[in-house]
Each structure stands twice: as structure tokens, then as C-alpha cells.
């Protein structure tokens, strides 16, 4: 049954009143489906108001789908048709409350990748570096990914031990001013109350972020990239651990190994290898962070926040198969119009996977059944790409071009619906081109395991005007 968010002929008047129509459809109890029309209402009804930004849009969007952070939502009285009887409804309900939570596919079959981007933003980041900033913001549904299905409208925390102290307050938000890859990151703010308890010097909480479906007895690898933003009160120490817990409460996780890596710009990466040992076929799990705080002054409140820049889960490759290296094989440029004085055309490229050189071959006879390489890589072991960053760099003279680190980001794949192409227009380039000038275009991929290809695995093409 259809519900129009604009309220055209819909019971409840649309907008934040959509819940009134959906409550009659009752999809969870009656098994009926809901077709929701015009969800862009959250932007289109407010976009012309002074001071309206993508951050304010997200607050409005979050209220419609997940509910307010606190308090109630005041709604105008819904219009009624002539002769329509009054229909009394309870307080506001977010749209997500009418439908069961469905986790993403098993990351063993489809690797999970999230940079907590809703498909809009103000800037673009590559490995923590802002490579682009827009005056009016940008939109690209190809870059939309999970924003964490367990942190809205606010995270639900629990202690890691048996204590019964008051839990810290937690707030979630999207940060479009700082990110690791993409256009935004997930901001988590924690406020620990003052405590006189003897054990309050060390407090550890569990913060679930994303639900997943995992198959038992399979090996997975997960990594999270985060940045701590310290508060302004007093000194404290923090410890972070990436962890998983079953939603049912049965803790059957077997974490085989953990590692921590310091990245640039204040970012850090946590990586774990894990499996589930239960007898069931699969489990619905929550992936999140265990945050421990150590302070010498627990009798004073403590506030801090952290940014979650990226979350990835994928199959763990056996050591015997860690030999496939993804690369961009070639890049090409085709002009839109032949002999045009302006640069206008399409970049295309192709990807490949290479095997390393064989150091020792012990094939003793033509009948030897052991191959030099592993010749049966599965789909889950073959890397693929989420998107590609495109860079441009003008030649300094007829023969020379500067180092690749001087190249300027000009966009990504996907905005035109194509995974391995990019349209180039001279007026969109961030530098001036003169006749007979050459430009080098670089293609750099982001794999589905969250890794940006090093430049020696990327491709480029030179284009002359």
C-alpha cells in the first residue's frame, strides 16, 4: 500500500505524520508491504530556507527514519477530508519502528564496506586528507553506504563488567568536516558522569555500531579506522578494541588475532581476525567498539568524542592464497569531439589481478600435481573496487610532468552510473590549459577491503590538446 511523504491524499498528512498511515497498514502484524513515495521531502521542503545545510537535512532525515535524540516530536493537526471521522493516534513513531532490522548480506559473500556516507557531503577525503571542498555541497548516490544501523537516534551502551553505575550519555552524528575516505565519518560523543565508586578510575563500555550476518566456522577479517577527539576537561587515557557480540547474547566469538596501527592525521586502525564456533549455521552479530577510560579524577565529569572513519569486514584469506595483488591495468582517453580546441572526453580503465614471481619451483616431472601458483582463486578471494578516485596533472613543459603527489583530485567514478569511466570537461579542471598543453590523468582505486591502491598499482594516461 502506498504512502506519500508529501501527504498528497495520504492519511496523516505526510511528512513526520507518515506513521499514522503506516500504523493502519501494520506491515509487521498484517504482513502488508508499504510503498513509500517522495522521501526527498526532508530536503525539498526546507532547501530554500536561510541557513539550511546538509547537516540540518541529516537531522531532519534521521528524525523521520530513526526518531529524535530525545523528547517528543510536535506535529500539526493532519487535514481531514470532508466527512472523514477523527482518527486518534499515539505519539510520533519513526519509520524504522514499523519494520524488523535486516542486517547486510554475509560479508563472506559480499564484503562489507562503510565510510558512514549518506551520499551527500561538503568535502571529499582520501586517506584522511581533504582533496576537495564544495561551496554548495555535493550529492552522489553511488557513494551512499551504511551509516551504522545501531547508533541512531543514539547509541545504546552497556558496561563491559558487572558494575551498576550510571552509564555515560552517548550521542551520534555525521561529521562532514573530517573523514578517512569519502565525504563523512561517524561522530560518537561520550559523557561520563562523576563517580565516587572505587572502581570508577577504570570504566569500560561496549558501543554497538553495525549489525552483520556471519556464518559459523568461517574465518573473517575486520578493521575499523577511528580518531580520538579529546575533551576539554582533564587528562585521561583511553583504550579501544574492535569486538563482536551476538545480538541474542550468546558470546561465541573466537578472536584469533588483533593488531593496531597508527595512521597519519591522528587516525588509528584496529584489525581483528575472528570466527564463530557455535553449532548454529549463522548468527546476527553487532560489531562495535569497546572503549575503556582511565582517569585519576573519576569524581569529575569526563567528556570526549571520536570519529569512526571506516569499517570493513571480509573473508580472511588463507596464508597459502595471500598472493593476489589488485591493480589498474590500463587507462585510456577518448575525445567527445574530434579536433576540438577544448579538452572534452571520457576516461576508461580496466582492473586486473597479478600473481607474484615464483621464487622456487619444485616441479620434478610433467606428472607433478602441485602447480607453481594457486590456480583456483574463489570470488571471495578476488579483490574488487568500491570506486575510483581520478586525478589530473598538467605537464610542466613539453616533456616533463611533476611527481604524482602534485596531482589534483578531480572526481570519482560512479556519478554517471558507470563503474570504470569518467567524463572530463576542461571547464571543470582546477587549472588552466593552454593550446598544445598535455595533461596526465591518474586512476586510483579503493578496494572492497577498504584499501587505497598505492600509486605503483595505479594507471595513468597522457592527453594532448
Which ranges hold each PLM region?
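Substrate-binding cleft of secreted/luminal carbohydrate-active enzymes
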Residues: 3-168
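Short carbohydrate-recognition loop motifs
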Residues: 169-204
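Extra-cytoplasmic beta-strand recognition segments
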Residues: 205-240, 270-274, 311
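Extracellular beta-strand ligand-recognition surfaces/modules
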Residues: 224, 269-311
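Extracellular carbohydrate recognition and processing domains
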Residues: 249-282
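Extracellular polysaccharide-targeting segments
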Residues: 292-338
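Conserved aromatic anchor
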Residues: 330-333, 340-385
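Beta-strand-rich modules
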Residues: 390-394, 419-465
Amino acid at each position: 500500500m502506498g504512502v506519500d511523504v508529501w501527504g498528497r491524499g495520504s492519511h496523516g498528512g505526510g511528512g513526520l505524520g507518515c506513521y499514522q498511515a503506516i500504523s493502519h497498514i501494520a506491515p509487521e502484524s498484517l504482513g502488508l508491504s508499504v510503498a513509500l513515495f517522495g522521501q526527498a521531502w526532508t530536503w525539498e521542503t526546507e532547501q530554500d530556507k536561510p541557513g539550511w545545510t546538509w547537516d540540518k537535512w541529516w537531522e531532519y532525515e534521521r528524525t523521520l527514519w530513526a526518531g529524535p535524540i530525545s523528547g517528543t516530536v510536535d506535529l500539526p493537526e493532519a487535514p481531514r477530508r470532508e466527512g472523514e471521522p477523527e482518527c486518534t493516534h499515539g505519539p510520533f513513531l519513526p519509520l524504522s519502528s514499523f519494520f524488523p532490522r535486516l542486517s547486510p548480506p554475509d560479508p563472506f559473500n559480499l564484503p562489507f564496506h562503510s565510510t558512514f556516507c549518506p551520499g551527500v557531503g561538503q568535502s571529499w577525503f582520501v586517506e584522511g586528507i581533504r582533496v576537495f571542498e564544495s561551496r554548495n555541497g555535493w550529492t552522489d548516490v553511488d557513494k551512499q553506504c551504511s551509516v551504522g544501523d545501531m547508533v541512531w537516534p543514539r547509541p545504546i551502551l552497556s558496561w563491559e563488567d558487572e558494575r551498576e553505575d550510571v552509564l555515560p550519555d552517548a550521542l551520534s552524528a555525521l561529521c562532514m568536516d573530517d573523514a578517512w575516505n569519502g565525504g563523512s565519518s561517524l561522530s560518537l560523543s561520550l559523557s561520563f558522569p562523576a563517580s565516587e565508586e572505587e572502581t570508577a578510575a577504570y570504566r569500560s563500555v561496549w558501543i554497538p555500531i553495525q549489525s552483520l550476518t556471519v556464518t559459523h566456522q568461517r574465518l573473517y577479517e575486520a578493521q575499523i579506522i577511528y580518531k580520538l577527539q579529546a575533551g576539554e576537561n582533564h587528562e585521561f587515557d583511553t583504550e579501544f578494541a574492535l569486538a563482536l557480540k551476538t545480538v541474542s547474547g550468546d558470546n561465541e566469538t573466537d578472536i584469533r588475532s588483533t593488531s593496531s596501527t597508527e595512521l597519519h592525521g591522528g587516525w588509528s586502525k584496529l584489525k581483528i581476525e575472528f570466527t564463530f564456533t557455535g553449532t548454529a549455521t549463522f548468527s546476527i552479530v553487532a560489531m562495535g567498539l569497546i572503549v575503556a577510560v582511565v582517569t585519576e579524577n573519576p569524581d569529575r565529569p569526563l567528556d570526549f568524542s571520536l570519529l569512526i572513519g571506516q569499517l570493513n569486514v571480509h573473508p580472511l584469506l588463507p596464508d597459502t592464497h595471500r598472493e593476489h595483488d589488485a591493480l589498474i591495468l590500463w587507462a585510456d582517453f577518448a575525445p567527445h569531439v574530434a579536433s576540438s580546441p577544448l579538452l572534452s572526453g571520457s576516461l576508461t580503465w580496466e582492473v586486473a589481478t597479478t600473481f607474484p614471481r615464483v621464487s622456487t619451483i619444485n616441479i620434478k616431472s610433467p606428472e607433478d600435481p602441485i602447480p607453481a601458483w594457486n590456480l583456483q582463486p574463489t570470488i571471495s578471494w578476488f579483490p574488487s573496487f568500491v570506486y575510483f578516485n581520478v586525478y589530473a596533472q598538467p605537464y610542466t613543459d613539453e616533456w616533463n610532468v611533476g611527481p604524482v603527489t602534485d596531482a589534483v583530485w578531480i572526481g570519482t567514478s560512479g556519478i554517471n552510473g558507470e563503474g570504470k569511466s569518467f567524463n572530463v570537461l576542461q571547464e571543470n579542471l582546477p587549472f588552466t590549459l593552454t593550446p598544445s598543453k598535455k595533461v596526465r590523468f591518474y586512476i586510483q582505486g579503493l578496494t572492497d577491503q577498504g584499501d587505497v591502491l598505492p600509486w605503483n598499482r595505479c594507471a595513468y594516461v597522457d592527453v594532448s590538446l
